[in-house]
Amino acid sequence: MPELPEVETVRRGLADLLPGQAVVRATVFDSPKSFPNSPADVQQFLYGAHVTAVRRRAKVLMIDLDTRYSLVIHLKMTGQLIFRGANSFAGGHPNDSLIGELPDRSTRVQIDFTDGSRLFFNDQRKFGWMKLMPTDEIENLPFMQKVGPEPLDKKTEAGDFIKRIRRRQNSMIKPAFLDQSVIAGVGNIYADEALWAAKIHPQTRVRNVSDDQLEDLFNELRQILQLSIDQGGSTDKNYVDAEGRKGNYLSFAHVFRREGQPCHRHPDQEIVKMKVSGRGTHICPVCQVEIK
């Protein structure tokens, strides 16, 4: 599943191309699961609408329209947004095989614009979705009300993070860190990387982690997320950015997918892969000692 840096990379690519585009047609290939709106909604609020902005909240994308409606998209595991223009290609999280004829068998929604360009929402496993809804009602969606603060927002401070994660005192730190109500957009890759950077074992209980360590974890997370965005995200399996390029962050990774390789702090110690709450987890046993 794409995490915050990957979704933000997709957003930036589409934000360069979609604003100003006018919708002329929408074709739904998989309804109602992937696109639950009625034809009447599409006719009234999507046809003829101009794109005004492309936004992100946590791992969710929002394409705002001048009808005061928005297309809200969650890519989930294998969702893809692919923009095809006369002389341009953009998208996010597609397989290389999808850079070809579109629509294909994984296409769930196709949106056509007046200049002949098209936006495809593809999803092989059908976990993702696209929904047309009033812009001012997005914040009332259940998952939007539960999601925590944005880690890269200047208004978000370490104290906010500490207060929220302390609500899970008896939880192991990694699953608490992955809780989207604690901090938005963090997934397995960046949880592993930030915990290594802060020298915290992922199985340590939150109650045994000091406030200073939690502040360090928050600050390390911010630096790692920004580095990943600068590098176009992480190419884990099939992710590419809005220009069709693979993300480069994993070449900077310290632990994720580096099992059996030497730790960058302790070259004599290999990175180990383990399971924490059912999630594959990468650690350095020397850097990250579990506190019980």
Annotate each PLM feature.
Residues 1-4, 151, 155, 210-218:
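Generic detection of long, well-ordered alpha-helical segments
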Residues 71-185, 190-197:
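Phosphate/anion-contacting hairpin/loop surfaces
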Residues 22-42, 55, 89, 160-292:
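Basic, nucleic-acid-binding surfaces and adjacent catalytic neighborhoods in DNA/RNA-processing proteins
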Residues 1-130, 268:
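Gly/Gly-Pro- and Ser/Thr-rich, intrinsically disordered tail segments characteristic of DNA damage-repair
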